[in-house]
Protein backbone atom coordinates (compact mmCIF):
# COMPACT_ATOMS: atom_id res chain seq x y z
CA UNK A 1 0.00 0.00 0.00
CA UNK A 2 1.09 3.58 -0.57
CA UNK A 3 4.36 4.59 -2.19
CA UNK A 4 6.01 1.65 -3.92
CA UNK A 5 9.57 0.83 -2.78
CA UNK A 6 9.87 3.72 -0.30
CA UNK A 7 10.62 1.50 2.69
CA UNK A 8 13.29 -0.47 0.83
CA UNK A 9 14.81 2.76 -0.53
CA UNK A 10 15.11 4.30 2.94
CA UNK A 11 16.65 1.05 4.19
CA UNK A 12 19.12 1.21 1.31
CA UNK A 13 19.90 4.84 2.19
CA UNK A 14 20.68 3.73 5.79
CA UNK A 15 18.32 6.22 7.47
CA UNK A 16 15.78 3.47 8.18
CA UNK A 17 17.10 0.57 10.23
CA UNK A 18 15.50 -2.65 11.49
CA UNK A 19 15.53 -3.17 15.26
CA UNK A 20 14.83 -6.08 17.58
CA UNK A 21 11.23 -5.52 18.67
CA UNK A 22 11.81 -7.38 21.93
CA UNK A 23 14.40 -4.84 23.10
CA UNK A 24 11.88 -2.00 23.10
CA UNK A 25 9.23 -2.49 25.77
CA UNK A 26 7.83 0.97 26.53
CA UNK A 27 6.74 3.85 24.29
CA UNK A 28 5.38 7.32 24.92
CA UNK A 29 2.04 6.53 23.30
CA UNK A 30 1.19 4.38 20.29
CA UNK A 31 -0.62 5.64 17.17
CA UNK A 32 -2.13 3.04 14.82
CA UNK A 33 -3.22 3.34 11.19
CA UNK A 34 -6.13 1.02 11.89
CA UNK A 35 -7.30 -0.01 8.43
CA UNK A 36 -3.83 -0.94 7.14
CA UNK A 37 -3.17 -3.13 10.18
CA UNK A 38 -6.68 -4.60 10.09
CA UNK A 39 -6.25 -5.65 6.44
CA UNK A 40 -2.80 -7.09 7.17
CA UNK A 41 -4.25 -9.22 9.99
CA UNK A 42 -7.28 -10.21 7.88
CA UNK A 43 -5.00 -11.60 5.18
CA UNK A 44 -3.50 -14.03 7.70
CA UNK A 45 -6.66 -15.53 9.25
CA UNK A 46 -9.55 -17.77 8.19
CA UNK A 47 -12.69 -16.21 9.64
CA UNK A 48 -14.16 -13.21 11.42
CA UNK A 49 -13.90 -14.80 14.85
CA UNK A 50 -10.18 -15.40 14.42
CA UNK A 51 -9.72 -11.88 13.01
CA UNK A 52 -11.44 -10.37 16.05
CA UNK A 53 -9.35 -12.40 18.48
CA UNK A 54 -6.03 -11.63 16.79
CA UNK A 55 -6.74 -7.92 16.32
CA UNK A 56 -7.78 -7.44 19.95
CA UNK A 57 -4.70 -9.36 21.05
CA UNK A 58 -2.48 -6.99 19.07
CA UNK A 59 -4.13 -3.89 20.56
CA UNK A 60 -3.88 -5.23 24.11
CA UNK A 61 -0.21 -6.02 23.49
CA UNK A 62 0.38 -2.45 22.32
CA UNK A 63 -1.34 -1.08 25.43
CA UNK A 64 1.20 -2.96 27.55
CA UNK A 65 4.05 -1.36 25.62
CA UNK A 66 2.70 2.16 25.23
CA UNK A 67 0.30 2.67 28.10
CA UNK A 68 -2.19 4.22 25.70
CA UNK A 69 -3.13 3.34 22.13
CA UNK A 70 -4.87 5.66 19.67
CA UNK A 71 -6.59 3.92 16.77
CA UNK A 72 -6.94 6.24 13.77
CA UNK A 73 -9.93 5.15 11.70
CA UNK A 74 -10.93 6.20 8.18
CA UNK A 75 -14.48 7.53 7.95
CA UNK A 76 -16.40 9.19 5.15
CA UNK A 77 -15.61 9.65 1.47
CA UNK A 78 -12.49 11.42 0.21
CA UNK A 79 -13.39 13.24 -3.02
CA UNK A 80 -9.90 13.41 -4.50
CA UNK A 81 -9.49 9.68 -4.02
CA UNK A 82 -12.17 8.69 -6.55
CA UNK A 83 -9.69 7.58 -9.23
CA UNK A 84 -7.78 5.53 -6.66
CA UNK A 85 -11.02 3.91 -5.47
CA UNK A 86 -12.02 3.06 -9.04
CA UNK A 87 -8.67 1.37 -9.68
CA UNK A 88 -8.86 -0.51 -6.39
CA UNK A 89 -12.38 -1.74 -7.20
CA UNK A 90 -11.19 -2.96 -10.58
CA UNK A 91 -8.20 -4.72 -9.02
CA UNK A 92 -10.36 -6.10 -6.21
CA UNK A 93 -12.85 -7.57 -8.70
CA UNK A 94 -10.05 -9.28 -10.63
CA UNK A 95 -8.63 -10.68 -7.39
CA UNK A 96 -12.08 -11.83 -6.25
CA UNK A 97 -12.74 -13.57 -9.59
CA UNK A 98 -9.37 -15.33 -9.39
CA UNK A 99 -10.01 -16.49 -5.83
CA UNK A 100 -13.51 -17.69 -6.71
CA UNK A 101 -12.04 -19.88 -9.43
CA UNK A 102 -9.42 -21.13 -7.00
CA UNK A 103 -12.14 -21.85 -4.42
CA UNK A 104 -14.19 -23.82 -6.95
CA UNK A 105 -11.12 -25.85 -7.85
CA UNK A 106 -10.29 -26.62 -4.20
CA UNK A 107 -13.91 -27.50 -3.40
CA UNK A 108 -13.96 -29.93 -6.31
CA UNK A 109 -10.57 -31.46 -5.53
CA UNK A 110 -11.32 -32.10 -1.86
CA UNK A 111 -14.14 -34.43 -2.86
CA UNK A 112 -11.70 -36.65 -4.72
CA UNK A 113 -9.08 -37.06 -2.01
CA UNK A 114 -8.74 -40.69 -0.93
CA UNK A 115 -6.09 -43.08 0.26
CA UNK A 116 -2.95 -42.46 2.28
CA UNK A 117 -3.17 -39.49 4.73
CA UNK A 118 -6.64 -38.66 3.44
CA UNK A 119 -7.75 -36.90 6.64
CA UNK A 120 -4.60 -34.79 6.90
CA UNK A 121 -4.79 -33.73 3.25
CA UNK A 122 -8.49 -32.89 3.54
CA UNK A 123 -7.87 -30.89 6.72
CA UNK A 124 -5.16 -28.86 5.01
CA UNK A 125 -7.34 -28.26 1.96
CA UNK A 126 -10.26 -27.23 4.19
CA UNK A 127 -8.06 -24.60 5.84
CA UNK A 128 -7.29 -23.21 2.39
CA UNK A 129 -11.00 -23.25 1.48
CA UNK A 130 -11.89 -21.41 4.69
CA UNK A 131 -9.23 -18.78 4.05
CA UNK A 132 -10.30 -18.26 0.43
CA UNK A 133 -13.95 -17.99 1.50
CA UNK A 134 -13.06 -15.34 4.08
CA UNK A 135 -10.90 -13.38 1.63
CA UNK A 136 -13.74 -13.37 -0.90
CA UNK A 137 -16.03 -12.06 1.85
CA UNK A 138 -13.57 -9.26 2.64
CA UNK A 139 -13.20 -8.30 -1.02
CA UNK A 140 -16.47 -6.40 -0.52
CA UNK A 141 -15.54 -3.03 1.02
CA UNK A 142 -18.86 -2.89 2.87
CA UNK A 143 -18.05 -6.16 4.62
CA UNK A 144 -14.66 -4.75 5.64
CA UNK A 145 -16.27 -1.67 7.19
CA UNK A 146 -18.98 -3.65 8.97
CA UNK A 147 -16.58 -6.20 10.42
CA UNK A 148 -14.07 -3.52 11.51
CA UNK A 149 -16.77 -1.45 13.20
CA UNK A 150 -17.93 -4.55 15.05
CA UNK A 151 -14.41 -5.24 16.31
CA UNK A 152 -13.94 -1.61 17.40
CA UNK A 153 -16.95 -1.85 19.73
CA UNK A 154 -14.78 -4.02 21.99
CA UNK A 155 -12.77 -0.90 22.86
CA UNK A 156 -15.66 1.47 23.61
CA UNK A 157 -15.15 1.30 27.38
CA UNK A 158 -11.40 0.80 27.37
CA UNK A 159 -9.73 3.83 28.94
CA UNK A 160 -6.39 2.78 27.47
CA UNK A 161 -7.65 2.92 23.88
CA UNK A 162 -8.89 6.00 22.01
CA UNK A 163 -10.87 5.70 18.79
CA UNK A 164 -9.93 8.69 16.62
CA UNK A 165 -12.21 8.99 13.58
CA UNK A 166 -10.73 10.74 10.54
CA UNK A 167 -13.60 12.28 8.59
CA UNK A 168 -12.85 12.64 4.86
CA UNK A 169 -9.12 12.43 5.56
CA UNK A 170 -6.76 9.46 5.33
CA UNK A 171 -6.08 7.94 8.73
CA UNK A 172 -2.31 7.76 8.15
CA UNK A 173 -2.28 11.46 7.19
CA UNK A 174 -4.20 12.55 10.31
CA UNK A 175 -2.18 10.14 12.45
CA UNK A 176 1.11 11.80 11.45
CA UNK A 177 -0.36 15.27 11.94
CA UNK A 178 -1.38 14.28 15.46
CA UNK A 179 2.03 12.69 16.01
CA UNK A 180 3.67 16.05 15.27
CA UNK A 181 1.37 17.68 17.84
CA UNK A 182 2.27 14.91 20.28
CA UNK A 183 5.96 15.67 19.66
CA UNK A 184 5.47 19.39 20.34
CA UNK A 185 4.15 18.60 23.83
CA UNK A 186 6.22 15.55 24.81
CA UNK A 187 9.45 15.99 22.85
CA UNK A 188 9.20 12.67 21.01
CA UNK A 189 7.09 10.97 18.41
CA UNK A 190 4.78 8.15 19.51
CA UNK A 191 5.36 4.69 18.10
CA UNK A 192 3.74 4.70 14.64
CA UNK A 193 2.12 1.43 13.54
CA UNK A 194 1.17 1.16 9.87
CA UNK A 195 1.78 -0.92 6.76
CA UNK A 196 1.11 2.05 4.44
CA UNK A 197 4.31 3.43 2.91
CA UNK A 198 2.79 6.93 2.65
CA UNK A 199 3.40 6.96 6.41
CA UNK A 200 7.15 6.91 5.69
CA UNK A 201 6.70 9.99 3.49
CA UNK A 202 4.91 11.90 6.26
CA UNK A 203 7.49 10.78 8.81
CA UNK A 204 10.18 12.35 6.62
CA UNK A 205 8.80 15.86 7.14
CA UNK A 206 11.13 16.59 10.08
CA UNK A 207 14.49 15.21 11.20
CA UNK A 208 13.40 13.94 14.63
CA UNK A 209 13.96 10.23 15.37
CA UNK A 210 10.90 8.01 14.98
CA UNK A 211 9.96 4.43 15.72
CA UNK A 212 7.75 2.86 13.06
CA UNK A 213 6.30 -0.63 13.14
CA UNK A 214 4.30 -2.98 10.95
CA UNK A 215 3.00 -6.38 12.02
CA UNK A 216 6.35 -8.13 11.85
CA UNK A 217 9.14 -5.53 12.01
CA UNK A 218 10.22 -2.54 14.08
CA UNK A 219 12.16 0.30 12.43
CA UNK A 220 14.05 3.33 13.65
CA UNK A 221 13.88 6.24 11.23
CA UNK A 222 16.14 9.28 11.49
CA UNK A 223 15.44 11.25 8.31
CA UNK A 224 17.86 13.81 6.89
CA UNK A 225 17.04 16.54 4.38
CA UNK A 226 18.27 14.11 1.72
CA UNK A 227 15.83 11.43 2.93
CA UNK A 228 13.00 13.96 2.82
CA UNK A 229 13.97 14.69 -0.79
CA UNK A 230 14.20 10.97 -1.61
CA UNK A 231 10.76 10.33 -0.11
CA UNK A 232 9.20 13.13 -2.17
CA UNK A 233 11.02 12.03 -5.32
CA UNK A 234 9.77 8.46 -4.83
CA UNK A 235 6.20 9.71 -4.33
CA UNK A 236 6.52 11.71 -7.56
CA UNK A 237 8.06 8.95 -9.68
CA UNK A 238 6.54 5.76 -8.23
CA UNK A 239 3.24 7.36 -7.27
CA UNK A 240 1.35 7.84 -4.02
CA UNK A 241 -2.30 7.72 -2.95
CA UNK A 242 -3.26 10.82 -4.97
CA UNK A 243 -0.75 10.90 -7.82
CA UNK A 244 -0.14 7.84 -10.02
CA UNK A 245 3.51 8.67 -10.72
CA UNK A 246 5.59 9.25 -13.85
CA UNK A 247 4.77 6.59 -16.43
CA UNK A 248 7.90 4.91 -17.76
CA UNK A 249 10.09 5.52 -14.71
CA UNK A 250 10.61 3.81 -11.36
CA UNK A 251 12.98 4.28 -8.43
CA UNK A 252 14.22 1.02 -6.96
CA UNK A 253 17.07 -0.04 -4.66
CA UNK A 254 18.86 -1.23 -7.81
CA UNK A 255 19.06 2.21 -9.44
CA UNK A 256 19.19 4.38 -6.30
CA UNK A 257 22.99 4.63 -6.42
CA UNK A 258 22.74 6.24 -9.88
CA UNK A 259 20.37 8.97 -8.69
CA UNK A 260 21.66 12.32 -7.45
CA UNK A 261 19.90 13.35 -4.24
CA UNK A 262 19.53 16.90 -2.93
CA UNK A 263 18.15 18.76 0.06
CA UNK A 264 15.69 20.96 -1.82
CA UNK A 265 12.81 19.52 -3.84
CA UNK A 266 13.10 21.93 -6.79
CA UNK A 267 12.34 21.36 -10.45
CA UNK A 268 16.01 21.62 -11.50
CA UNK A 269 17.07 19.14 -8.83
CA UNK A 270 14.27 16.73 -9.71
CA UNK A 271 15.21 16.68 -13.40
CA UNK A 272 18.87 16.18 -12.44
CA UNK A 273 17.83 13.19 -10.31
CA UNK A 274 15.84 11.72 -13.18
CA UNK A 275 18.69 12.15 -15.67
CA UNK A 276 20.17 8.69 -15.12
CA UNK A 277 19.50 7.71 -18.74
CA UNK A 278 18.98 9.42 -22.09
CA UNK A 279 15.49 10.62 -22.95
CA UNK A 280 13.91 11.64 -26.24
CA UNK A 281 10.79 13.75 -26.54
CA UNK A 282 8.04 11.50 -27.87
CA UNK A 283 5.10 13.93 -27.98
CA UNK A 284 4.50 17.67 -27.98
CA UNK A 285 2.35 17.37 -24.85
CA UNK A 286 3.27 19.65 -21.97
CA UNK A 287 2.23 19.30 -18.35
CA UNK A 288 2.03 21.73 -15.45
CA UNK A 289 5.21 20.63 -13.69
CA UNK A 290 4.98 23.31 -11.01
CA UNK A 291 1.50 22.13 -10.06
CA UNK A 292 2.69 18.52 -9.75
CA UNK A 293 5.73 19.44 -7.65
CA UNK A 294 3.66 21.76 -5.43
CA UNK A 295 1.12 18.99 -4.83
CA UNK A 296 3.80 16.45 -3.85
CA UNK A 297 5.52 19.02 -1.63
CA UNK A 298 2.31 20.00 0.15
CA UNK A 299 1.18 16.39 0.57
CA UNK A 300 4.55 15.33 1.99
CA UNK A 301 4.59 18.32 4.35
CA UNK A 302 1.16 17.33 5.73
CA UNK A 303 -0.55 20.40 4.29
CA UNK A 304 -4.26 19.94 3.66
CA UNK A 305 -4.39 18.79 0.02
CA UNK A 306 -7.87 17.30 0.31
CA UNK A 307 -9.46 20.34 -1.35
CA UNK A 308 -6.96 20.24 -4.24
CA UNK A 309 -7.56 18.84 -7.69
CA UNK A 310 -4.86 16.15 -7.88
CA UNK A 311 -2.58 16.26 -10.93
CA UNK A 312 -3.03 13.69 -13.67
CA UNK A 313 -0.46 11.09 -14.57
CA UNK A 314 2.07 11.95 -17.27
CA UNK A 315 5.05 10.19 -18.80
CA UNK A 316 8.53 10.79 -17.46
CA UNK A 317 9.44 12.34 -20.84
CA UNK A 318 6.50 14.77 -20.67
CA UNK A 319 7.53 15.78 -17.15
CA UNK A 320 11.22 16.24 -17.99
CA UNK A 321 10.80 18.25 -21.19
CA UNK A 322 7.97 20.36 -19.76
CA UNK A 323 10.30 21.13 -16.84
CA UNK A 324 13.12 22.12 -19.23
CA UNK A 325 11.02 24.07 -21.75
CA UNK A 326 11.29 27.37 -19.88
CA UNK A 327 15.10 27.27 -19.86
CA UNK A 328 15.31 26.16 -23.48
CA UNK A 329 12.81 28.77 -24.69
CA UNK A 330 14.67 31.51 -22.82
CA UNK A 331 17.90 30.42 -24.51
CA UNK A 332 16.22 29.96 -27.89
CA UNK A 333 15.00 33.57 -27.89
CA UNK A 334 18.63 34.62 -28.45
CA UNK A 335 19.71 31.58 -30.46
CA UNK A 336 20.31 31.46 -34.22
CA UNK A 337 18.97 28.04 -35.10
CA UNK A 338 18.97 28.32 -38.89
CA UNK A 339 22.71 29.00 -39.34
CA UNK A 340 25.59 26.46 -39.28
CA UNK A 341 26.76 25.27 -35.89
CA UNK A 342 30.01 27.34 -35.76
CA UNK A 343 27.92 30.49 -36.27
CA UNK A 344 25.42 29.34 -33.64
CA UNK A 345 28.28 28.86 -31.21
CA UNK A 346 29.81 32.29 -31.87
CA UNK A 347 26.43 33.90 -31.26
CA UNK A 348 25.65 31.88 -28.12
CA UNK A 349 28.97 32.13 -26.25
CA UNK A 350 29.50 34.97 -23.80
CA UNK A 351 33.19 36.00 -24.09
CA UNK A 352 35.22 35.20 -20.97
CA UNK A 353 38.30 37.12 -22.17
CA UNK A 354 39.35 39.90 -24.52
CA UNK A 355 39.30 38.85 -28.18
CA UNK A 356 42.09 40.42 -30.23
CA UNK A 357 42.06 41.42 -33.89
CA UNK A 358 43.78 38.28 -35.15
CA UNK A 359 41.23 36.12 -33.33
CA UNK A 360 38.39 38.12 -34.88
CA UNK A 361 39.87 37.37 -38.30
CA UNK A 362 40.06 33.68 -37.38
CA UNK A 363 36.41 33.72 -36.32
CA UNK A 364 35.47 35.47 -39.57
CA UNK A 365 37.13 32.71 -41.55
CA UNK A 366 34.82 30.19 -39.90
CA UNK A 367 31.68 31.92 -41.14
CA UNK A 368 30.48 29.80 -44.03
CA UNK A 369 26.72 29.62 -44.42
CA UNK A 370 27.02 27.06 -47.20
CA UNK A 371 28.93 24.53 -45.10
CA UNK A 372 26.50 22.60 -42.90
CA UNK A 373 29.10 20.16 -41.58
CA UNK A 374 30.91 20.92 -38.34
CA UNK A 375 34.66 20.53 -37.90
CA UNK A 376 35.66 19.49 -34.37
CA UNK A 377 38.85 21.53 -34.59
CA UNK A 378 36.83 24.61 -35.57
CA UNK A 379 34.49 24.08 -32.61
CA UNK A 380 37.44 23.80 -30.24
CA UNK A 381 39.10 26.86 -31.74
CA UNK A 382 35.96 28.99 -31.35
CA UNK A 383 35.60 27.84 -27.75
CA UNK A 384 39.22 28.72 -26.99
CA UNK A 385 38.96 32.18 -28.57
CA UNK A 386 35.94 32.96 -26.37
CA UNK A 387 37.83 31.79 -23.26
CA UNK A 388 36.34 28.31 -22.88
CA UNK A 389 37.87 24.86 -22.63
CA UNK A 390 36.84 21.47 -23.99
CA UNK A 391 38.52 19.33 -21.33
CA UNK A 392 38.55 19.13 -17.53
CA UNK A 393 35.69 21.62 -17.21
CA UNK A 394 34.34 22.27 -13.71
CA UNK A 395 31.36 24.06 -15.20
CA UNK A 396 29.89 22.87 -18.50
CA UNK A 397 27.95 25.54 -20.41
CA UNK A 398 27.19 23.78 -23.70
CA UNK A 399 27.59 20.39 -25.28
CA UNK A 400 27.91 19.68 -29.00
CA UNK A 401 26.26 16.47 -30.16
CA UNK A 402 25.73 15.56 -33.83
CA UNK A 403 25.59 19.22 -34.92
CA UNK A 404 23.20 20.02 -32.07
CA UNK A 405 24.00 22.73 -29.56
CA UNK A 406 22.87 21.50 -26.13
CA UNK A 407 22.52 23.33 -22.83
CA UNK A 408 23.87 21.84 -19.61
CA UNK A 409 22.46 21.93 -16.07
CA UNK A 410 24.64 21.28 -13.03
CA UNK A 411 27.18 19.72 -15.43
CA UNK A 412 25.01 16.62 -14.95
CA UNK A 413 23.23 16.39 -18.29
CA UNK A 414 22.77 18.07 -21.66
CA UNK A 415 19.49 18.95 -23.33
CA UNK A 416 17.60 20.81 -26.00
CA UNK A 417 13.89 20.78 -26.78
CA UNK A 418 13.91 17.20 -28.05
CA UNK A 419 16.58 15.20 -26.22
CA UNK A 420 18.34 14.83 -22.88
CA UNK A 421 21.70 13.10 -22.59
CA UNK A 422 23.07 12.13 -19.22
CA UNK A 423 26.64 13.07 -18.41
CA UNK A 424 27.45 9.40 -17.81
CA UNK A 425 26.65 8.59 -21.45
CA UNK A 426 28.34 11.55 -23.16
CA UNK A 427 31.32 9.99 -24.98
CA UNK A 428 30.21 11.55 -28.27
CA UNK A 429 29.71 15.05 -26.85
CA UNK A 430 32.15 17.94 -27.07
CA UNK A 431 32.11 19.89 -23.81
CA UNK A 432 32.33 23.66 -23.77
CA UNK A 433 32.95 25.08 -20.32
CA UNK A 434 35.51 26.43 -17.91
Curated annotation (Swiss-Prot):
Coiled coil: none annotated. Its cofactor is Mg(2+). Binds 2 magnesium ions per subunit. They probably participate in the reaction catalyzed by the enzyme. One of its GO terms (cellular component) is virion component. GO terms for biological process: DNA repair. Changing residue 33 to A: Complete loss of function. Keywords: DNA damage, DNA repair, Early protein, Hydrolase, Magnesium, Metal-binding, Nuclease, Virion. Mg(2+) 2 binds at residues 196, 198. Mg(2+) 1 binds at residues 33, 74, 168, 170. The keyword DNA damage applies. Its EC number is 3.1.-.-. It is an enzyme of class 3 (hydrolase). It is found in: Virion. InterPro entries: Poxvirus_G5 (IPR007678). Induction: Expressed in the early phase of the viral replicative cycle. Pfam families: Pox_G5. Signal peptide: none annotated. Putative nuclease that seems to be required for double-strand break repair, homologous recombination, and production of full-length viral genomic DNA. Belongs to the XPG/RAD2 endonuclease family. FEN1 subfamily. This is Putative nuclease OPG089.
Amino acid sequence: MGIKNLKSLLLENKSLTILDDNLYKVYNGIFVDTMSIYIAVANCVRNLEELTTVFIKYVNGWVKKGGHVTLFIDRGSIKIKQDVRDKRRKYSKLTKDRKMLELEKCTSEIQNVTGFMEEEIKAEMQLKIDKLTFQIYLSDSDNIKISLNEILTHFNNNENVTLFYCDERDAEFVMCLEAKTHFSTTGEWPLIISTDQDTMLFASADNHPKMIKNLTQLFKYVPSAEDNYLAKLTALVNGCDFFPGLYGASITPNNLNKIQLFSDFTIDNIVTSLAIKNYYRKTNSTVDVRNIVTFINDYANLDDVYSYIPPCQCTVQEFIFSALDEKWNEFKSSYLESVPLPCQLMYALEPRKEIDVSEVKTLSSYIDFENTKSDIDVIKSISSIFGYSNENCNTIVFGIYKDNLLLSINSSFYFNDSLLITNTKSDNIINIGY
